[in-house]
């Protein structure tokens, strides 16, 4: 039974990774360029030194969206349950988890938030991965979801990953990261 579950997890992770990789490659061919500030507002970005656990990181990252009414508490719980049930497939780029739940799980509008951690946290309960950032993707309208997924392309760029790890990075610096 455990072997079957591991195979299921591996297939799910591999197919999701392939889908994201295909998206990122197609996005790199586009002419229009964007910055993080095009997708996340300054009040939805947080920088912390440390976080005790991956589920706490998701809760903290989501808190600005919850306060504004963009998402409900159950959306946060469903994101945490998705990691518990499906593993770390949401870590699309090195050390960054792009967490989300379903369109019927308490999302009111497309939104996004980012939590940057100075000290990485271990993400997931199995297939654990080290992360330094959590990006919350609140996708209510599937037709517009590719706009939010552009964040993965921007944050996945090597120079942007290096910048995120600099000790003196500010919210303004994060907003200016671009593709």
Spans of model-derived segments:
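Cytosolic covalent-transfer regions centered on His/Cys nucleophiles
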Residues: 1-179
């Amino acid at each position: 039974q455990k072997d079957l579950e591991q195979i299921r997890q591996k297939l799910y992770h591999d197919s999701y990774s392939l889908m994201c990789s295909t998206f990122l490659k197609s996005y790199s061919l586009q002419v229009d360029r964007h910055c993080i500030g095009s997708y996340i507002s300054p009040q939805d970005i947080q920088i912390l030194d440390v976080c005790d656990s991956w589920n706490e990181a998701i809760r903290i990252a989501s808190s600005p969206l919850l306060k504004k009414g963009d998402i409900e508490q159950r959306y946060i719980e469903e994101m945490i349950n998705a990691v518990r049930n499906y593993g770390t497939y949401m870590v699309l780029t090195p050390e960054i988890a792009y967490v989300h739940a379903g369109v019927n799980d308490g999302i009111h509008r497309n939104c996004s938030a980012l939590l940057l951690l100075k000290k990485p946290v271990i993400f997931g309960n199995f297939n654990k991965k080290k992360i330094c950032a959590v990006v919350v993707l609140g996708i209510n309208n599937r037709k517009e979801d590719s706009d939010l997924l552009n964040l993965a392309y921007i944050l996945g760029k090597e120079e942007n990953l290096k910048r995120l790890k600099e000790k003196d990075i500010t919210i303004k610096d994060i907003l200016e990261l671009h593709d």
